[in-house]
């Protein structure tokens, strides 16, 4: 009787530890009064290693890598349990980050907020914090969807210091553009329930196939609605979302040309589901080929997964695939360092 009780207490303690998400606000020097939020789950003991998660175009960290399907069950918690300081960045205007004044004005009054050129700077702020304040020496970035564009640009700028770059569901398809494509303002809007319905990907999944986890069906839309302030005068449940990411995706040079891949000297992993609407086998192969200076390149397709596989029933395969790549990178780094040391003697 005592053994099951102790086991239950130990499991509860582990879950509670994994749920301790610390959120820090990091100022944006170029924008006085504005800040980005970084959500972190610490490992049991410091390792000097971190995984930084970068979200996509419409919803923030705590609806993505930080979404808890059950106590202690999130991608952040998974990475922390494996010894990494697991952090997720909310870009400006998303989640717990600040909202610039333009998000309270009509969208046509300002250019798109948090476009890739600005998001690169925000990733740099998070990485600088991890290195200087959390004493991290090894940083792996895991980016999703549109977030893979600024993450790649940051990897190119970071001059080989980044340990690895994972591109989950990158934007490898060219989106149709015509003269009727509207110009983007500062922000766009959607209700949480509308975005949830989009996550079901009914247009590409077989009629009887449902991939979303039950916890997403139960809690995701309400959590998304609570993640952003409601602006008086907007319709009930309407969320204002920075338009920079959508403007990047719709730009004439979008698709493969969006990625500053040719100068990246970091190991790269492209992972996606067979039902992903933004990348397929050919697109993933073409994008990976652009990383001509990357010393290690992996590509993985996980069947029965969509563009939001991190919210679906096969998410643990995604977690494990990324973890395997990260550990392969670290093993290679150790082997290379050992070889260099032996050669020097």
Q: Which residues does each predicted region cover?
A:
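Catalytic histidine-centered segment of alpha/beta-hydrolase-like enzymes
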Residues: 305-316
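Alpha/beta-hydrolase active-site loop
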Residues: 107-133
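Alpha/beta-hydrolase
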Residues: 176, 180-271
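Short, surface-exposed "cap/lid" segments of acyl-processing enzymes
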Residues: 45-88
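Conserved hydrolase catalytic core segment
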Residues: 137-142, 146-175
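N-terminal cap/lid segment of alpha/beta-hydrolase-fold proteins
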Residues: 16-46
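Conserved alpha/beta-hydrolase "acid-adjacent" motif
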Residues: 277-283
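Glycine-rich "HGGG/HGxG" loop immediately N-terminal to the catalytic nucleophile
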Residues: 63, 89-111, 307
């Amino acid at each position: 009787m005592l053994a099951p009780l102790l086991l239950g207490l130990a499991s509860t303690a582990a879950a509670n530890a994994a749920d301790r998400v610390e959120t820090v606000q990091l100022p944006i020097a170029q924008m006085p009064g504005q800040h980005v939020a970084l959500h972190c789950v610490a490992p049991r003991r410091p390792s000097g290693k971190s995984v930084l998660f970068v979200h996509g175009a419409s919803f923030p960290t705590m609806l993505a890598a930080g979404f808890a399907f059950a106590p202690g069950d999130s991608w952040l918690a998974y990475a922390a349990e494996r010894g990494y300081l697991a952090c997720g960045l909310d870009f400006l205007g998303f989640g717990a980050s600040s909202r610039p004044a333009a998000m309270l004005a009509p969208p046509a009054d300002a250019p798109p907020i948090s476009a890739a050129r600005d998001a690169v700077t925000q990733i740099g702020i998070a990485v600088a914090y991890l290195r200087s304040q959390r004493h991290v020496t090894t940083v792996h970035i895991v980016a999703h969807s549109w977030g893979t564009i600024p993450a790649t640009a940051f990897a190119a700028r970071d001059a080989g210091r980044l340990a690895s770059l994972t591109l989950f569901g990158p934007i490898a398809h060219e989106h149709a553009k015509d003269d009727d494509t509207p110009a983007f303002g500062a922000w766009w809007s959607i209700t949480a329930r509308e975005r949830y319905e989009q996550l079901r990907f009914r247009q590409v999944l077989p009629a009887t196939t449902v991939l979303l986890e039950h916890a997403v069906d139960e809690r995701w839309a309400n959590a998304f609605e609570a993640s952003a302030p409601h602006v008086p005068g907007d319709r009930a449940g309407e969320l204002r979302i920075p338009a920079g990411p959508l403007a990047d995706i719709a730009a004439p040079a979008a698709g493969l040309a969006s990625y500053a891949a040719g100068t990246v000297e970091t190991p790269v992993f492209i992972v996606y589901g067979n039902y992903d609407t933004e990348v397929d086998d050919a697109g993933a192969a073409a994008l990976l080929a652009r990383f001509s200076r990357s010393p290690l390149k992996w590509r993985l397709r996980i069947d029965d997964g969509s563009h939001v596989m991190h919210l679906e029933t096969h998410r643990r395969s995604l977690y494990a695939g990324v973890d395997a790549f990260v550990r392969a990178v670290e093993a290679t780094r150790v082997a290379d360092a050992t070889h260099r040391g032996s050669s020097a003697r």
